[in-house]
Regions:
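Short secondary-structure junctions and interdomain/linker hinges
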Residues: 38, 100, 104, 174-178, ...
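Short helix-coil junctions and helix-kink-helix linkers
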Residues: 79-84, 193-204
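Non-catalytic, well-ordered alpha-helical scaffold segments
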Residues: 114, 121-123, 161, 165, ...
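Positively charged, polyanion-binding regions of nucleic-acid-associated proteins
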Residues: 157-200
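Short amphipathic alpha-helical interaction segments
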Residues: 202-221
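C-terminal engagement modules used by replication, chromatin/transcription, nuclear envelope/ESCRT
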Residues: 216-268
Length: 268
């Protein structure tokens, strides 16, 4: 981090580019109108007007070129590498999260905005949203993208009972493969591998997606499968085995294990 030097902020560049973009837009509009006039004058044989408007087009083209050069100079003066390496981008991203109410945790350069994982690549000035590279130098825009994605996920249809039953099936397979006793606590991270056994499946259904589904199951309050087996989440002292989710109130909850068991009362 720099000492007393002025902090970089994309919003300052954005404000600088706004009037320059307007100049470019106006220049393009002027050229388009003049070109239409030139086409009409060429067809009608109006040489005097044609000569005048071609001259006007040349002047408009020079003005447009000048406006584009100003934009290039503004962009050239913005050191993207320093913006990332100084921590200014990260600090403004965190501020945008607070402003927009997006939950975030982690430390530079890796953050979690549940259920997304955000990584800042300072060497190449790239942002990764999970595995996807996002070309974004504006913290506010990045956080808005995350927020939109979260809203889309939350609106997507989800059958908690069906998911619970799928988990139960994977659990039974895991109990057999791992030679555990029925009803034993199994780590969710281990169960995930049975739910998505092949690597190509994990690309489409990664652990962040798994965590999001766990959160929706947790929030649903469902604690029994279709065939009557009870399910119970559990904690762990091993933080590496915990999966962080957010509850209905946006508070973080750490889940580590799960077990499915037959309620003795139901067997009577």
């Amino acid at each position: 981090m720099r000492g007393n030097e002025e902090k970089m902020n994309y919003e300052n560049l954005y404000q600088t580019l706004q009037p320059q973009e307007k100049s470019v837009k106006d220049g393009l509009s002027s050229l388009q109108k003049l070109f239409k006039a030139v086409l009409r004058e060429t067809e009608s044989g109006d040489i005097k007007s044609l000569s005048r408007d071609i001259g006007s087009m040349a002047d408009a083209a020079l003005a447009l070129s000048s406006a584009l050069e100003e934009m290039k100079d503004s962009l050239g003066s913005f050191d993207t590498k320093a913006y990332f390496e100084s921590g200014d981008f990260a600090a403004q991203m965190l501020a945008a999260c607070e402003e927009k109410g997006v939950d975030v945790r982690g430390d530079f350069p890796v953050y979690e905005m549940f259920p997304y994982r955000v990584r800042l690549d300072t060497e190449n000035q790239d942002v990764y949203l999970d595995r996807k590279k996002v070309q974004c130098m504006r913290p506010q825009s990045l956080v808005s993208t995350v927020q939109t994605g979260q809203e889309k996920l939350n609106k997507a249809s989800f059958n908690a009972l069906t998911f619970a039953s799928e988990l139960a099936d994977a659990y039974e397979l895991a109990v057999l493969k791992l030679k555990k006793n029925p009803g034993a606590d199994l780590y969710l991270t281990s169960l995930y591998k049975f739910l998505a056994p092949m690597s190509r499946f994990r690309k489409d259904y990664d652990q962040q997606s798994f965590a999001f589904d766990l959160a929706r199951l947790y929030i649903s309050g469902i604690n029994e499968t279709k065939n009557g087996k009870k399910l119970q989440f559990g904690p762990s002292r091993n933080s590496n085995k915990c999966i962080r989710i957010l509850d209905a109130d946006g508070k973080e909850v750490f889940l580590a294990t799960i077990r499915f068991y037959q309620d003795p009362a139901s067997e009577i």
